[in-house]
UniProtKB/Swiss-Prot annotation:
Belongs to the aspartate/ornithine carbamoyltransferase superfamily. OTCase family. Reversibly catalyzes the transfer of the carbamoyl group from carbamoyl phosphate (CP) to the N(epsilon) atom of ornithine (ORN) to produce L-citrulline. InterPro entries: Asp/Orn_carbamoyltranf_P-bd, Asp/Orn_carbamoylTrfase, Asp/Orn_carbamoylTrfase_sf, Asp_carbamoyltransf_Asp/Orn-bd, Orn/put_carbamltrans, OTCase_ArgI. One of its GO terms (biological process) is arginine biosynthetic process via ornithine. The keyword Protein biosynthesis does not apply. The gene is argF. This is Ornithine carbamoyltransferase. Keywords: Amino-acid biosynthesis, Arginine biosynthesis, Cytoplasm, Transferase. It catalyses: carbamoyl phosphate + L-ornithine = L-citrulline + phosphate + H(+). One of its GO terms (cellular component) is cytoplasm. It comes from Carboxydothermus hydrogenoformans (strain ATCC BAA-161 / DSM 6008 / Z-2901).
Length: 311
């Protein structure tokens, strides 16, 4: 199986088929079991991963660093200010140089076009650790978490409430590809990108499931197996924060809203969370919340991705 993935990039959930997503999740589960049992898996012994960060991170940095170490490899942390990128070196040159020294590159940055350019010029696999357009590693962890708690993915309904942002984009594509029903509720003007909606619509049609885009959070959450949200203002949107709080207030995930979901629903949030804004403490700290299991699964999902692309 590894041979079919080796050398590929992972920039978007659309880079994988539904079947491939399931294979990644199966490997992630296997690696998680081995790690819990204390079984060493030095699959990437002698391999180095360059990790470029233009945006601050807790979960992305720790999960990739720990993941590489557990797989026997070496993680190399690089901030934009530490590198020549901050002095105007072209991304193409950075890609060519790093490709001669490392076995893979993970980048967490603002512009999705930067990641695409890096991947175009790099001769080693490039992994999208987050851009303003997608966050595919997060959604691999989310799908792993859903499968662990629900036993399956196909046929479940996932509801997104809030901003049609990068996490929403990756969730729509990933969930649709594995046969889930997808419902997205956003304020007017904050809908997901139309290209993403078209991809998700095509995938749900293939499975015979549904894609719902609405401005009504109750409509989206009704009958949901999984409820997901994110912060109202992402990094780089701080200047819009006050305005966004006003716009998104009706989209808070609270006890009243989730009462419309299935009784055994689970709640996901990529973290960090702002209790009292996009979600209440009642929900995120309640019995239906699996956000910390979700955070842990960043490690296991990314170990699977690293194994397949760099192994």
């Amino acid at each position: 199986m590894i041979a079919s993935y080796r050398g590929r990039d992972f920039l978007s959930m659309n880079d994988l088929t539904g079947e491939e997503i399931e294979e990644v999740l199966d490997l992630a589960s296997e690696l998680k079991i081995r790690q819990k049992k204390g079984i060493s898996t030095p699959i990437l012994k002698g391999k180095t991963l360059a990790m470029i960060f233009s945006k601050n991170s807790t979960r992305t940095r720790v999960s990739f660093e720990v993941g590489m170490v557990q797989l026997g490899g070496y993680p190399l942390f690089i901030t934009a200010t530490d590198s020549q990128l901050s002095r105007g070196e072209p991304i193409a040159d950075t890609a060519r140089v790093l490709s001669r020294m490392v076995d893979g590159i993970m980048i967490r940055t603002y512009s999705h076009s930067e990641v695409e350019e890096l991947a175009y010029y790099a001769d080693v696999p490039v992994i999208n650790g987050l851009t303003d357009y997608e966050h595919p590693c997060q959604i691999m962890a989310d799908l792993l978490t859903i499968k662990e708690h629900k036993g399956q993915l196909r046929g479940l309904k996932v509801a997104w409430v809030g901003d049609g942002n990068n996490v929403c984009h990756s969730l729509m594509i990933g969930a649709a590809k594995v046969g889930m029903e997808v419902a997205v509720a956003t304020p007017p003007g904050y809908e997901p990108d139309q290209k993403v909606s078209l991809i998700a619509q095509k995938e749900t049609s293939r499975w015979g499931t549904k894609l719902l885009l609405t401005h009504d959070p109750v409509e989206a959450v009704t009958g949901a197996d999984v409820v997901v949200t994110d912060v109202w203002a992402s990094m780089g949107q701080e200047a819009e924060s006050a305005e966004r709080v006003k716009v998104f207030e009706p989209y808070q995930v609270n006890g009243e809203l989730v009462s419309h979901a299935k009784q055994d629903f689970i709640f996901l949030h990529c973290l960090p969370a702002h209790r009292g804004e996009e979600v209440t403490a009642e929900v995120i700290d309640g019995e239906h919340s699996v956000v910390f299991a979700e955070a842990e699964n960043r490690l296991h999902a990314q170990k699977a991705i690293l194994t397949l692309l760099l192994g």
